[in-house]
Amino acid sequence: MKVLKTLLILVFILGLLGCDEEPKIANTVSTFYFIRHAEKDRSNPENIDPELNQKGLGRAMHWAEILNDVAVDAIYSTDYERTQMTAAPTAVKKNITVQYYDPESIDIEQFKADNINKRVLVVGHSNTTPDFVNKMIGKEKYQQIDDLENGSLFIVEIVNGIATDIRLNFNCNCPD
């Protein structure tokens, strides 16, 4: 009986020691790279879905080089020629199938959940890209991009639900 009592006390003490630490919370880190499509062909103002012009094709290749050392897990693009063509060089280089999204109906929380612990490239437009970034960071920080500006890179990192962001600008000395 004395042995059983000692054994129970020992098990109880070991149990208390095992409960000393609070459970560890797994770190989650998701990084999103937002860009606007590269320069589009403006030769036909009636064309609502133009392709990229020569400079835009160069910039699309430039983005692929900039993102070369980033282990991109997913690429999203709107369903337009200019955004698809901007995403294509990076998608080919990384062997990733581009997924399409509708900026008007995307569920931001679901998008975050679907891409937890991933590095994601998102290609959008002058109005949708800053809006998407604002929704991801939970504040109205960025305004619509000027229609002639195609070199902004917004990086949003979400660590354990807390978002940080930065906007970088890249020049492209691509031929016209």
Predicted features, each with a name:
Residues 10-13:
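Short, linear, compositionally biased motifs with a strong N-terminal bias
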Residues 32, 116-124:
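Generic beta-sheet signal
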Residues 21-24, 28-113, 129-132, 139-153, ...:
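Active-site-proximal alpha-helix that buttresses catalytic centers in soluble enzyme cores
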Residues 15-18:
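C-terminal motif of bacterial Sec signal peptides marking the signal peptidase cleavage site
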Residues 3, 138-139:
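A structural signal for alpha-helix termini and helix-coil/disorder junctions
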Residues 1-8:
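Bacterial N-terminal signal peptides that target proteins for export
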